[in-house]
Amino acid sequence: MRVLIKNGTVVNADGQAKQDLLIESAIVRQLGNNISPQLPYEEIDATGCYVFPGGVDVHTHFNIDVGIARSCDDFFTGTRAAACGGTTTIIDHMGFGPNGCRLRHQLEVYRGYAAHKAVIDYSFHGVIQHINHAILDEIPMMVEEGLSSFKLYLTYQYKLNDDEVLQALRRLHESGALTTVHPENDAAIASKRAEFIAAGLTAPRYHALSRPLECEAEAIARMINLAQIAGNAPLYIVHLSNGLGLDYLRLARANHQPVWVETCPQYLLLDERSYDTEDGMKFILSPPLRNVREQDKLWCGISDGAIDVVATDHCTFSMAQRLQISKGDFSRCPNGLPGVENRMQLLFSSGVMTGRITPERFVELTSAMPARLFGLWPQKGLLAPGSDGDVVIIDPRQSQQIQHRHLHDNADYSPWEGFTCQGAIVRTLSRGETIFCDGTFTGKAGRGRFLRRKPFVPPVL
């Protein structure tokens, strides 16, 4: 199969040019002007549009069981939504397994979840929910099998203590893996939450008040120091929501420490006032939404390069699930927001079209740096000969209002309802195959491939 994309502006992280792009047998074969491929081929006219590498979302939670509920997006509906939003690769954070299980247990479970459902290419982050000799011995074998990143939690049921974190950091570093972490101070959160519950303060706004930004920032600072103690182990902070944590990361970078950080559209564009609305329960996520001042600090990090990745933390529970389980109590509500379909459009509209970032920086945040950090470069995150033919075409002339009824996930609401975006996803290609075109999903379940990722190699800081 040959596909020729003509008349568009092809953008990579290191530059852009108005040129044609030829994909053949799922791979980018040529970029240039006046390409004349051998017949037969499909021609796509991208006049007036940007031609970007397909998005790489390195933080999703599909089909996750959080104990009180299972998320309503599986690997079909979740990756379908991703495809319709211009994302062609996801790396899913696997949920916790049974108490005491091996690392491999969850990999086998999740490969079963995705095998016949994923629309786009996918991989997984390992999850370390306890530490013992068997777990530490298993890590190098998992890296050899293509899982080169693992997640630790400093909160929730399977949080690790500092000694366990140090052991994990050392072994992951030795094994060629990147440590990712959910950083919140569990003890401080538990104390604040107990105070509010005892006082009968259980409305959604108290979710945010029970998890102040200092809980997140303290845990970030602690992880930075533990990573240094563990031999300058590489560290990746997920879903940053505040400026103080970003300050700590800037300081670590200034000291040449290998640390990277992601944020998410919700922390850039939504704020804590959402909790005081009639449907405030639908904005329960952790870390919580912050105030506009923290948003501005994150946008500074987006603009000046301090933030490396924009992912989604897509973790969808329906409003019916939320209301039935929580009964109005924030502490009982399952956490998470949908967003995998909206990431690329929201960042393009609020970043590129407002002049906050360049199209090249957009590529760096949404595909190139995620691919480099997580062992997929240059197969993903790049439009160059030899790379996969993963493409998203965005028309900056079109304006769209986000409406849940037009989205493709399995949620029954969107936190972005009514947002107007300048720029529309008009086509998504995965390995040269059109899987979304002009509002219509054209992919199929099971066409996505499991990606064996390369061991971690740090990008130049």
Curated annotation (Swiss-Prot):
<feature type="binding site">
    <location>
        <position position="239"/>
    </location>
    <ligand>
        <name>a divalent metal cation 2</name>
    </ligand>
</feature>
<protein>
    <recommendedName>
        <fullName>D-phenylhydantoinase</fullName>
        <ecNumber>3.5.2.-</ecNumber>
    </recommendedName>
</protein>
<feature type="modified residue" description="N6-carboxylysine">
    <location>
        <position position="151"/>
    </location>
</feature>
<feature type="binding site" description="via carbamate group">
    <location>
        <position position="151"/>
    </location>
    <ligand>
        <name>a divalent metal cation 1</name>
    </ligand>
</feature>
<dbReference type="InterPro" id="IPR011059">
    <property type="entry name" value="Metal-dep_hydrolase_composite"/>
</dbReference>
<dbReference type="GO" id="GO:0006208">
    <property type="term" value="P:pyrimidine nucleobase catabolic process"/>
</dbReference>
<feature type="binding site">
    <location>
        <position position="156"/>
    </location>
    <ligand>
        <name>substrate</name>
    </ligand>
</feature>
<keyword id="KW-0378">Hydrolase</keyword>
<dbReference type="InterPro" id="IPR050378">
    <property type="entry name" value="Metallo-dep_Hydrolases_sf"/>
</dbReference>
<feature type="binding site">
    <location>
        <position position="313"/>
    </location>
    <ligand>
        <name>a divalent metal cation 1</name>
    </ligand>
</feature>
<feature type="binding site">
    <location>
        <position position="286"/>
    </location>
    <ligand>
        <name>substrate</name>
    </ligand>
</feature>
<comment type="function">
    <text>Catalyzes the stereospecific hydrolysis of the cyclic amide bond of D-hydantoin derivatives with an aromatic side chains at the 5'-position. Has no activity on dihydropyrimidines. The physiological function is unknown.</text>
</comment>
<dbReference type="GO" id="GO:0005829">
    <property type="term" value="C:cytosol"/>
</dbReference>
<feature type="binding site">
    <location>
        <position position="61"/>
    </location>
    <ligand>
        <name>a divalent metal cation 1</name>
    </ligand>
</feature>
<dbReference type="InterPro" id="IPR011778">
    <property type="entry name" value="Hydantoinase/dihydroPyrase"/>
</dbReference>
<dbReference type="GO" id="GO:0016812">
    <property type="term" value="F:hydrolase activity, acting on carbon-nitrogen (but not peptide) bonds, in cyclic amides"/>
</dbReference>
<feature type="binding site">
    <location>
        <position position="335"/>
    </location>
    <ligand>
        <name>substrate</name>
    </ligand>
</feature>
<dbReference type="InterPro" id="IPR023766">
    <property type="entry name" value="D_phenylhydantoinase"/>
</dbReference>
<dbReference type="Pfam" id="PF01979">
    <property type="entry name" value="Amidohydro_1"/>
</dbReference>
<dbReference type="GO" id="GO:0046872">
    <property type="term" value="F:metal ion binding"/>
</dbReference>
<dbReference type="InterPro" id="IPR032466">
    <property type="entry name" value="Metal_Hydrolase"/>
</dbReference>
<keyword id="KW-0479">Metal-binding</keyword>
<feature type="binding site">
    <location>
        <position position="59"/>
    </location>
    <ligand>
        <name>a divalent metal cation 1</name>
    </ligand>
</feature>
<comment type="similarity">
    <text>Belongs to the metallo-dependent hydrolases superfamily. Hydantoinase/dihydropyrimidinase family.</text>
</comment>
<comment type="subunit">
    <text>Homotetramer.</text>
</comment>
<feature type="binding site" description="via carbamate group">
    <location>
        <position position="151"/>
    </location>
    <ligand>
        <name>a divalent metal cation 2</name>
    </ligand>
</feature>
<dbReference type="InterPro" id="IPR006680">
    <property type="entry name" value="Amidohydro-rel"/>
</dbReference>
<feature type="binding site">
    <location>
        <position position="182"/>
    </location>
    <ligand>
        <name>a divalent metal cation 2</name>
    </ligand>
</feature>
